[in-house]
Structure formats: structure tokens, C-alpha cells
Amino acid sequence: MSAVTESVLESIISPVTMSEFLEEYWPVKPLVARGEVERFTSIPGFEKVRTLENVLAIYNNPVMVVGDAVIEESEGITDRFLVSPAEALEWYEKGAALEFDFTDLFIPQVRRWIEKLKAELRLPAGTSSKAIVYAAKNGGGFKAHFDAYTNLIFQIQGEKTWKLAKNENVSNPMQHYDLSEAPYYPDDLQSYWKGDPPKEDLPDAEIVNLTPGTMLYLPRGLWHSTKSDQATLALNITFGQPAWLDLMLAALRKKLISDNRFRELAVNHQSLHESSKSELNGYLESLIQTLSENAETLTPEQIFQSQDSDFDPYQSTQLVFRQLLTSYKF
């Protein structure tokens, strides 16, 4: 495999090279790269997230506050909600963790770097990506869960303790899951879930202490939790993880959408009389046959041509929501 041109990420994970990272770690094995925090200055726009004050000065969007302080305020209804940037510092002092989602909206240099990094990581062009800044104080953190995204975490201030545990229940998950939800599992996740979940404190986890200047590559699906008893600040670069299923479905949709029958309005099968149900079943069988024929003629080239599709409508919607809110003053 040909080597990848040296990059900002490569300079941070050194002595691991970008080629070694792609071959030995990406996309399933975590990597901890330690060094001085000054090396993060190679990240474009880093000076705008160097301190919590820097972040609050540029972030013109609602801030997610998370943790026990929120649970207490809401009388147990929720552990998180959105507040204005003006209120965020007050919640921070109460012990809530702050999440500045889509921080890259306010730092064009970071946005451009993320797009370049997406290409270096060989991700499809339509992959969702963003920067998130996390700030926590007085024991703030997140309980055990796994993500459907992958993260590059750059610890800027303070020390944060991470628990990392191999996921024996699912591989390549396509949705986020909080361990506190067990034994409830969403239908899609249930279809490929195996065994019993781990205990909530992840007793068999590896303990990783992130100190200023440490970078953690966190693959999707890895069980993890975080905790800090001091003020911490970290920059997360988050990438979606489009599966071959996503690309194939997008390519198949492009083939089928030209057929008017597939664009017809669907009906509620339960609302029909038996004779109509039988007639509809026959009609759907003909559509299934057409679908099968199109799937059989699907080519790798057609699949590759779908790489710029929108694989994450939720994140796309969130981005539009955040963009609209940037015009408001708090």
C-alpha cells in the first residue's frame, strides 16, 4: 500500500506513521499518543479552543450541559439539556459537563482541516464530520456507552480518566447505545447483539489517563466512560462510519427511483380488506422481483459512485439546525 503524505495528524501520533495508523489501528484498535500540548498548535485554528474562555468567545450556539447538576435541576427528568452560551459557565461551575457541538462552524480553519483529514482516513466523501469541544469540572463526565462514530480526542487541559473496554456484544455498530438502557435494545441493534452487557462500571476495562498533550483515537463501538475531578478541556474530531450497506442501498436507490412504481405512495396494509391485501401482496412481489434483478446487476463502480451520498440524515439535520441558530444573539 502506498504511503500517505505527512499530515498534521501524523506529526501528532509520531513515532507512529500515518501508514502504520491506517494499517494497524484504523478502524478498530484504539491508539494513545502522548506528548506536549504545544504540538496541538499544528492543528489549524487551535488557538480558538485553547481555553474555555476562547471557546465561549466564538461559540454563538446553544450549549449542551450534561451531568448530575442537570438531573438535580430537572428533578430526574433528564441528564442533559441546551442552554445559551451566557448560561453555560454557570452550569460549568455547578459541575455539569459542557458540550460545544459543531464547533467547526465557528472556525473555518478547523473545518478545512477536517475535510482534508477525512480524505487521509480514506472515508467516503459523504461521511459526516464535525468538531466538538468538551469542558468539565468537579467530577463531570459521561457514563458507559459506545458510539456509532469514531473520534480523535485531543486533551488540552486537565486530566481525564477514560475506561476503555472491548465490545463483546456487537461489532461495527450502526447506532449509539448507553449501557444504562440495558436490557432494552433498539430493534436494529438487537438483530446483531450477542450475550449479556458488561457491568455499568466496566470492571474489565483498560484505564487510560489523558493528560494535556495526549491524543486518543477512539474507534466506534468501543465501550467507554469518562470521569474527571478537575477542570478539563478537550477537542474531539468526530467522523461518521458509513458501512458498505449504506453505499449499496444508496446505489440501489439510484437505480430504482427511475421506476415510477417504486415512487408510488405506500399504504397501510392493516387497513385493507383481505381481497385488497392479496392483490397488494401480488403487486409487491413483482416489485421485489424487480428489486432483486436490479440488485444482481449492481456493480462496484455504481457503489463507489454513491460515496458522496448523505449517510447520516440526523447529523445533517443537526448541522442545519445549528447553522440557522448562528444568526441569533444570546
Curated annotation (Swiss-Prot):
Organism domain of life: Bacteria
InterPro entries: JmjC_dom, NO66-like
Positions of the JmjC domain: 96-256
Required cofactor names: Fe(2+)
Cofactor binding note of this UniProt entry: Binds 1 Fe(2+) ion per subunit.
Binding site for Fe cation: H145, D147, H224
Alphabetized UniProt keyword annotations: Iron, Metal-binding
Cited Pfam families: JmjC_2
GO molecular function list: metal ion binding
Family that this chain belongs to: Belongs to the ROX family.
The name this protein goes by in its record: Uncharacterized protein YxbC
Organism: Bacillus subtilis (strain 168)
